[in-house]
Amino acid sequence: MIILSKEQVILLHAQLIAETGGSEGVRDEELLESALYAPFQSFGDRDVYPSIQQKAARLGIGLTKNHAFVDGNKRIGAHTMLLYHPLI
């Protein structure tokens, strides 16, 4: 199971901004952490998002909707979601 760290996602975001333009930087670290941890929530003994597809989708949605970055939130959401693609 791939679990991206906050540092890895910040680095990926910086690379995306360098390649595609925009403003670099984290706007809210707590929202970033929330988006990164959401796919791995559980209730009792069950994962809320049990499949890799559901985890990837929840990660992409969280990064897109939380607006943790100054710019490029949709780009980083799509990019991190696609990192799971070879595993699906």
What do the PLM-derived regions correspond to, one by one?
Residues 1-88:
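FIC/Doc superfamily catalytic core
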